[in-house]
């Protein structure tokens, strides 16, 4: 497994805006999707391409196209939906799989309540979308679910991650690559990321 922190001035600037307590819901949504586009760009650098011939304005021309890689986006409900449009802007042909989980606030462990995976998941690269990687419990459970379904390759895109959650995933899933805009300082006693973004789901959906 590799952890890729996308070190770019645009990423830093946009993430800094998300950290501001009074950012409007509409702006939070827009920036979350902008950051997801930048993360998706980095996460797909290793896709193979092949030459194909197309009809250009002056006749046939050889162009590059992605070679036979089927992709499914996997937003984790509900906050992951706030990154989905950005991902599909970059990869409009991707299928969408949905995993519904919430974190038990007492045990901090995930509780699964809904799953709908794309057909032929065993032939697809899955890209998990979630703004926050905190304890790693939800991501761990989602990776297990995808692996049990036969998914051959898994990556994850996150806006911020805590070192504790990253360690959990690195230790258990060394074959999964993680792309993140920032690795924050730590978790607090309630399992929230510091400095973090606050409740990303509430900020995306305007429920608080």
From Swiss-Prot:
EC top class, as a word: transferase
EC nos: 2.4.2.9
Regulation: Allosterically activated by GTP.
Alphabetized UniProt keyword annotations: Allosteric enzyme, Glycosyltransferase, GTP-binding, Magnesium, Nucleotide-binding, Transferase
Recorded metabolic or biological pathway in which this protein acts: Pyrimidine metabolism; UMP biosynthesis via salvage pathway; UMP from uracil: step 1/1
Binding site for uracil: 193, 198-200
Membrane spanning stretches: none
Domain of life: Bacteria
Residues binding 5-phospho-alpha-D-ribose 1-diphosphate: 78, 103, 130-138, 199
Note describing how the cofactor binds: Binds 1 Mg(2+) ion per subunit. The magnesium is bound as Mg-PRPP.
Catalytic activity annotation: UMP + diphosphate = 5-phospho-alpha-D-ribose 1-diphosphate + uracil
GO biological process: UMP salvage; uracil salvage
Obligatory cofactor(s): Mg(2+)
Family the entry assigns: Belongs to the UPRTase family.
NCBIfam families (alphabetical): PRK00129.1, upp
HAMAP family reported in the protein's UniProt record: Upp_B
Function: Catalyzes the conversion of uracil and 5-phospho-alpha-D-ribose 1-diphosphate (PRPP) to UMP and diphosphate.
Record's protein name: Uracil phosphoribosyltransferase
Protein source organism: Nitratidesulfovibrio vulgaris (strain ATCC 29579 / DSM 644 / CCUG 34227 / NCIMB 8303 / VKM B-1760 / Hildenborough)
């Amino acid at each position: 497994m590799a952890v890729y922190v996308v070190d770019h001035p645009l990423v830093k600037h946009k993430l800094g805006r998300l950290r501001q307590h009074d950012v409007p819901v509409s702006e939070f949504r827009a920036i979350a999707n902008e950051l997801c586009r930048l993360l998706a760009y980095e996460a797909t650098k290793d896709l193979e391409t092949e030459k194909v011939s197309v009809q250009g304005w002056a006749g046939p021309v050889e162009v590059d196209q992605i070679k036979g890689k089927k992709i499914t986006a996997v937003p984790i409900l509900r906050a992951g939906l706030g990154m989905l449009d950005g991902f599909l802007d970059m990869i409009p042909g991707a299928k969408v799989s949905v995993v519904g989980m919430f974190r038990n606030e007492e045990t901090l462990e995930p509780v699964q309540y809904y799953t709908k995976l794309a057909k032929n998941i065993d032939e697809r690269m899955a890209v998990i979308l979630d703004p926050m990687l905190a304890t790693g419990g939800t991501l761990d459970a989602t990776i297990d679910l995808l692996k049990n379904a036969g998914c051959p390759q898994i990556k994850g895109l996150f806006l911020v991650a805590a070192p504790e959650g990253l360690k959990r995933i690195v230790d258990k899933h060394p074959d999964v690559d993680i792309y993140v805009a920032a690795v924050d300082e730590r978790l607090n006693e309630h399992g929230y990321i510091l400095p973090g973004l606050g409740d990303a789901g509430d900020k995306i959906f305007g429920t608080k």
